[in-house]
Amino acid sequence: MSTSIQSFLGNQYKTYLVLFLCALIIGIKLGTLIPLLSLILESRGYSNTQIGLNVVAQPLAVILFVRITPLIIHKIGLARSIVIAQIFTILLYFTFPIFESLTAWFFIRFLIGFAGALAWNAFDTWMLSMADDSNRGKIVTIYNTVFVIGFAIGPMVI
């Protein structure tokens, strides 16, 4: 690793690189899931309104559960929260082909939103706990930029 990257990110640069890689992967995952599921629903003949309401399930869960996720993180820890949320999300992805009902997909997406809220809070807590006053702004900027890049890459994967 070059010393310029290490000096820019600080002593914990390897941990930050892992964090940024996770942000990229989660961005790609979300950026792929939203349009892919919408295209599948459209091919099944659902209206744009029905598809839009289905898409709302994930952010709705984030809004409803973001206040309790810190309690879960405190109880089971940062690393476990991240791992459990990601495993839960991956398992939920495999349920889409099993259930064809729009209502079932709403609940699956809602649960993915809950897991996303847990992971989001855990990642943000991890990132902010590592950053100090001298690099916090840089770290948050890189983290969010990498996430958005992943989100932009997602539709290109389809």
Task: Identify the function of each model-found stretch.
Residues 11-59:
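Helix-loop boundary and gating motifs at the non-cytosolic
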Residues 55, 59, 140-148:
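Small-residue-rich transmembrane alpha-helices and their cytosolic helix-loop interfaces
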Residues 59-67, 151-152:
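Residue-level signature of mid-helix packing/kink "hotspots" within the transmembrane helices
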Residues 65-77:
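Helix-to-loop junctions at the C-terminal end of transmembrane segments
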Residues 77, 98-100:
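Helix-breaking motifs and short loop linkers at transmembrane-helix boundaries and internal kinks
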Residues 80-94:
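Structural signature of the two symmetry-related core transmembrane helices
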Residues 103-111:
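Paired small-residue
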Residues 118-131:
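Intracellular juxtamembrane helix-capping segments at the cytosolic ends
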